[in-house]
């Protein structure tokens, strides 16, 4: 009986020791430690759909991620989903180490999973851009939005900042429900919106100034076949983001590498017009949070 009692006490003590050891490992191990493969840091990169197709996006923007990986002595993999919402979900679910997220995608991921912004992308020297509503060139719109009532309007997916969030917040602020005011649809990419306008399949579609400029410069759309009928005020540009509890030293190094690039060097590594990064903090995206609250999404 005494032997059994001693064994029982030893077993309980051993169990407590094991549980304490496991707890120590959980506390001391970073929640988002970067993966190491064959002795080298391995990073999972993801970039929002900057161009009409994922292959075009990766072709134009992979060089900046390769540069970052090379500077860190890391290997990498890179993906570009077809929707702005998808990359936010991937970041939120822990499938991305460093993500180029749209402003709204970043805010949503921050709200759900504590995602942190390190830097804001510069476009033509500024960390800002504008949301657009583009229309067919022949539309007789003199007074907006009154003259557009009943027209075919296409917005982007609900994870898209300039393609959905900002136009929807604008319409709500002036008392318009797009679903009843227009012949309304949503979920298209910017490239699809611009293409359908070019071919007369829709009357109006959302876009962003930098995306439209890029498609014009690449010869993908004819600017004479469309016109801008509405634009937003300046919005904070895309967010270079990492998961909550990402390695602090690695965060600092990534921020330093990106923000120290000259505009000339940065432009050589990215799509047309994109030429650098500036340090960022969450409060820089307050205007995006405000729009989300207007629509009851936060």
Curated annotation (Swiss-Prot):
Keywords: Signal, Transport. The keyword Heme does not apply. GO terms for biological process: transmembrane transport. Residues 1-33 form the signal peptide. One of its GO terms (cellular component) is ATP-binding cassette (ABC) transporter complex. The keyword Transport applies. InterPro entries: PhnD. Belongs to the phosphate/phosphite/phosphonate binding protein family. Probably forms part of a binding-protein-dependent hypophosphite transporter. This is Probable phosphite transport system-binding protein HtxB. It comes from Stutzerimonas stutzeri (Pseudomonas stutzeri).
């Amino acid at each position: 009986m005494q032997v059994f009692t001693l064994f029982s006490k030893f077993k309980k003590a051993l169990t407590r020791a094991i549980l304490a050891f496991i707890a120590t490992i959980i506390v001391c191990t970073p929640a988002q430690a970067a993966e190491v493969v064959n002795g080298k840091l391995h990073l999972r990169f993801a970039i929002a759909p900057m161009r009409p197709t994922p292959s075009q996006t990766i072709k134009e923007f992979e060089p900046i991620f390769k540069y970052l990986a090379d500077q860190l002595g890391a290997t990498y993999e890179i993906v570009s989903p077809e929707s702005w919402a998808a990359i936010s979900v991937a970041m939120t679910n822990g499938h991305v180490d460093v993500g180029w997220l749209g402003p709204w995608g970043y805010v949503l991921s921050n709200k759900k999973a504590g995602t942190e912004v390190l830097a804001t992308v510069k476009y033509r020297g500024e960390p800002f851009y504008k949301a657009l509503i583009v229309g067919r060139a022949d539309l007789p719109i003199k007074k907006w939005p009154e003259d557009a009532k009943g027209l075919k309007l296409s917005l982007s997916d609900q994870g898209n900042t300039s393609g959905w969030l900002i136009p929807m917040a604008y319409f709500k602020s002036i008392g318009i429900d797009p679903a009843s005011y227009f012949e309304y649809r949503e979920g298209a990419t910017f490239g699809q919106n611009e293409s359908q306008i070019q071919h007369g399949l829709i009357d109006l579609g959302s876009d962003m100034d930098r995306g439209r400029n890029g498609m014009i410069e690449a010869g993908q759309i004819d600017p004479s076949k469309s016109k801008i009928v509405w634009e937003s005020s300046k919005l904070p540009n895309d967010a270079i983001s990492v998961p909550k509890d990402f390695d602090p030293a690695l965060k600092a190094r990534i921020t330093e590498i990106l923000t120290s690039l000259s505009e000339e060097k940065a432009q050589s590594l990215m799509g047309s017009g994109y030429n650098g990064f500036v340090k960022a903090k969450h409060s820089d995206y307050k205007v995006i949070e405000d729009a989300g609250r207007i629509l009851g999404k936060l």
